[in-house]
Structures are given as C-alpha cells and as structure tokens.
Amino acid sequence: MNKNHIHVSVRDLRKTYQTRSEEIEAIRKVQMEVNRSEFVSILGPSGCGKSTLLMAIGGLLPITSGTIEVDTTPVTRPRRDTGVVFQSPVLMPWRTIAQNVLFPIECLGLNVSDYTARAEELLSMTGLDEFSDNLPTELSGGMQQRVAICRALIHDPELLLMDEPFSALDAMTRDNMNQELLRIWQEHQKTVLFVTHSIREAVFLSDRVFVMSPRPPRR
C-alpha cells in the first residue's frame, strides 16, 4: 500500500448542536489529512470534540458544514470499508464470542459461513480461540475489548476508528492492549484513527498525533 496516498480528508469541518436556548459549537473548522496505512491518534481535553470528529468520519453523525472524504468519496453514511471500536465493548450478552464477532456480517447481509474461518483466525490472533463458544460475561474487560476489535476487523475494513477503547481498563491491561493493537496494525496495515486522553498512549502507538484545542475546538 502507498502510505503517501491520502485516505481520509477533513476540510473546514463544523458541527453544532441546538439546545432550547442556544446553539452549541462542538467542532469548529477542523482540518485533517490521514495517509493510507497510517496510525494517527487524536488527542485533547474532555469535551473538545474528539469523539464527535471520529463519529462524523465514520458516517455515524451528520455534520453542519465542511467536508469529509474517505478515498476521495464524500462520507454521508456509514461505509462498509470502515470498522469502529467504541469505549466499551458493547457485546450482546446472549450471543457467544464467535457470534458477536460475526454480527457485522449479518448486518451487511453477507453469508456468515463464508466468514467463519476469518472469525476463527481473528480470535486466534488475539489469543481468544479457546473462548469462541463462551458468553461475554465469562470474559474479563480486556478480553471483551479484544472481541470488539475482532468484530471491527471481521469484514476486513480499510479504515479502523477507535474511540478511547482502553480507557476503562486498568494500567497493566491497557499497556498489554496497546502492545496487542500495535501488533495487529503492523500485521494488517490498516489506516487507524485512535481517540485518547493519554499522551503516553498516543506517542507509543502513533505515526502522528493530532491535538485538538478546548471548546470551541479546532485543529
């Protein structure tokens, strides 16, 4: 892959929310370019719009003005070539680990049996192959987040969006997960946008770090 090819482009992005009494500006004139296969962290204080920016790039949140493009195509809705990992694993407790990983395939209307081997491969890669038939409640927080990463990768997306995925973990588990994520990225060379509060985490993981200012945020 050509790492100099621009994969994600954000231009003059603005996002506002309307309350009963006023219009709140969540993001103001954000500019960003991310190259293909690059690992980029988005760093900034609480409430500066990091998660808002990430969800907008994923097509999960409408924007007020500006443009977002992935592979030169404007983002207006969720894209099949994008995977998302949220702050909490949000696994379905009644489904097994393997069934949780395969859930996006069902949502996309694809044949689940065609992706069973890939689910097994991802679970093996993250050390969870022995837990494929377990329920989420039988796994630790760190293990559940690894399941969430497998789920985000099951349809082989080119772009992976991660919204503070390790913020709820203890320090040792978080360090282990950072090592695991870096290994996965080095093996698969996806483009990763990673939201975090931690300067240490951002520096450890990233090719580059984007820093957002306090509200009204800009970059």
Descriptions of predicted regions:
Residues 106, 113-131, 183:
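Conserved ABC ATPase "signature" region
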Residues 149:
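Hydrophobic anchor residue at the start of the ABC signature
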Residues 66-78:
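Conserved ABC transporter NBD signature motif
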Residues 43-45:
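The feature captures the beta-strand-to-loop junction immediately N-terminal to the Walker
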Residues 95-103:
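Short coil-to-helix segment of the ABC ATPase nucleotide-binding domain corresponding to the Q-loop/switch region
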Residues 160-163:
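Catalytic Walker B motif of ABC-type/P-loop ATPase nucleotide-binding domains
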Residues 134-137, 155:
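Conserved signature/switch motifs of ABC ATPase nucleotide-binding domains
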Residues 58:
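Helix-to-loop junction immediately C-terminal to a conserved catalytic motif
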